[in-house]
Amino acid sequence: MCIRDRPLSPLDGRYRGAVTGLADFLSEAGLNRARVEVEVEWLIALTDRSLFETSPLSDADKERLRALYRDFGQAEIDWLAEKEAVTQHDVKAIEYLVRDRLSALGLDSIAELTHFACTSEDINSASYALTVKRAVEEVWLPALDVVIAKLRELAAEHADAAMLSRTHGPVSYTHLRAHETRHDL
């Protein structure tokens, strides 16, 4: 029995339907899109300060650069897979992708600033932070809001039902604090 084509974990297997929305952010492709975003925004930040004899990019050029991560898709995923097979370095492949796209956009003059003064860890830590933040904001919190709405509905329906709480001391009455906990997030 060949197990290479099997899911890596139950999340890719039997629970895939429950976590599909997270793939946009927490998959390898989602991480690579965030890495491209970090590299592009770093380039924009450097040129905005006219560093190294550059001048600020026009708004149109900034939008064309930002399209690199906004329109990130299968072509970029495939390009990165080919390049990473050679480099054996994920962030270096991202750097090469950005440089390649800069050339295609006619922005060769700033290509040398790609990844300037950055380590792979700089790019990765910012990218992981972006992916987790967006997964929480765009997938997890909306799902939590649905659960809280259902709990409110059930609470109203069962408002007369007594609920006892006890941890270590005497029994006391309680509520679940779902709304307050969500507000704290």
Predicted region positions:
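Short, small-residue-biased leader/transition segments that mark boundaries at the very start
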Residues: M1-I3, A178-T181, L185
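A helix-coil-helix interface module used to build multimeric assemblies
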Residues: R4-R177
